[in-house]
Amino acid sequence: MRTMNLAGMIDHTFLKPEATEKDIVNLCHEAKQHKFATVCINPAYICTAAKLLHGSGVGVATVIGFPLGATMTEIKVQEIFAAKAHGAREVDIVINIGWAKSGNWEAVAKDITRAVEAAHCCGVTIKVIIETSLLTEEEKQKAAEIVKASGADYIKTSTGFAGGGATVEDVRNLKAWVGQSVKVKASGGIRSRETALQMVEAGADRLGTSSGVQIITV
């Protein structure tokens, strides 16, 4: 795979709580230079990133209900509308993990479906994070089925905040479960070109990483 093709699959990510405006400026500069798909940042910096990336072809992605997924559905929906209004093209939203672990799949489905409807209503791409490191195989499959049924654009492995990230096995399984109707984003622990290529080979359509520059310049 050519470097430029790989770069175009990367969400250049900086979601640390201590992220400064200078960090975001640097992130956007790198994203423009290397032609990454998006920058993925916390909501407070959407306006900054949107201004810096205007006309560059690099999108602005942000996170919703992040990283716990325990925000009320109504708040998640309002976050999506606000993100769009401030310049975000894509949103990465976390499922309510506690509901999933409780087996309350109906509530999980309603939460995600409302978020997907809100995102698509305002023309925003939505990626649903299921936090694979916290789920059993059975729970991962059930979550994948719900994401597929919701009409989401992507299913995403991880927030990177739960002590585990993407694995090749998880990416391969998620792709098998959602089929061609939903894309897969691998995120968490992708720090090398080798790992990135393994994720793509397993079925990942997008990669979330803070190591994008290192990955494409080795």
Swiss-Prot record:
> What does the record list as coiled-coil region(s)?
none
Q: Which CDD domains match?
A: DeoC (cd00959)
* One GO molecular-function entry: deoxyribose-phosphate aldolase activity
Kindly list the places in or outside the cell where this protein is found, as annotated in its UniProt entry: Cytoplasm
Where are the active-site residues found? 92, 156, 185
User: What processes does the entry annotate via GO biological process terms?
Assistant: 2-deoxyribose 1-phosphate catabolic process; carbohydrate catabolic process; deoxyribonucleotide catabolic process
Q: Which SMART domains match?
A: DeoC
Q: Does the record bear Lyase in its keywords?
A: yes
Family annotation (InterPro entries): Aldolase_TIM, DeoC, DeoC/FbaB/LacD_aldolase, DeoC_typeI
Primary location recorded for the protein, binned into one broad class: cytoplasm
Q: What does this protein do?
A: Catalyzes a reversible aldol reaction between acetaldehyde and D-glyceraldehyde 3-phosphate to generate 2-deoxy-D-ribose 5-phosphate.
Which family would the database say this protein is a member of?
Answer: Belongs to the DeoC/FbaB aldolase family. DeoC type 1 subfamily.
Query: Any idea what this protein is called?
Result: Deoxyribose-phosphate aldolase
Q: What is the lineage of its organism?
A: Bacteria, Bacillati, Bacillota, Clostridia, Eubacteriales
Its gene name is deoC
